[in-house]
Amino acid sequence: MNIQINNIHSTNSLSIIKALSRIEKYDIIVIGSDIYKKGECAGSLLVDKYYQAPPITQEAEYINFLNDVNEKENVDLLIPASDAEAVLLSKYINQVKTKFFLADYETVALFKDKLKATQELMKNNIKVPRICDNLFNEKKVIFRKRNSVNSLGIYIVDLEKAEYIENHFHPDYFVQPYIEGDTVIVDVFSDKEGVPKLIIPRKTIEIKDGTAFRSQIVYDETIIAI
């Protein structure tokens, strides 16, 4: 089985590569790519085959690159490993010859924008922290960048203790109350009809480069039922 993973300098891609290397049941060939030359990023030395890719911002060139690699390597599955790639693949789903699994473009693009995603969740009566229109009577808040990955663009400030506030008052950011407590990430595996088949809550133990690096699987019926 030939599996392609792009943007392999990232933590997400490296984690996927390491997970695939542990699978003994199947003969898996990992094909990796990134904008760097081979040897300039660690991931390029961890895959079976490596290709230097054009920047994902060059959409037409990137799609042609994916199709060229698919033709040369007969790729069975492409695993998107970044938000930007997920948006691009869903946008050009009919032009990419390699098989991959993603939601439709409207859904992927919606959740790329954290403010729009939060507003949509509210419309569907899903409980999320409210959006602060002003900071009067607020205590501790979090400024969130609308389009960002990992924990980039996060600014947390205790208004009762801070002597000054960084200027994040512009349309690229929005503000919510800061919620104290543990962070639980929930992995959901669904079938083609969107019916959940496997739900795994994970309590974050360690964060690396803005993402959950170590987690503890927890059985919480309340979270699973949501």
Where are each of the predicted segments found?
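A glycine-centered beta->alpha junction motif in the catalytic cores
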Residues: 181, 205-206
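Catalytic core of tubulin tyrosine ligase-like
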Residues: 195-202, 208
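Active-site nucleotide/adenylate-binding loops and adjacent lid/helix of ATP-dependent enzymes
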Residues: 97, 105-183, 190-195, 221
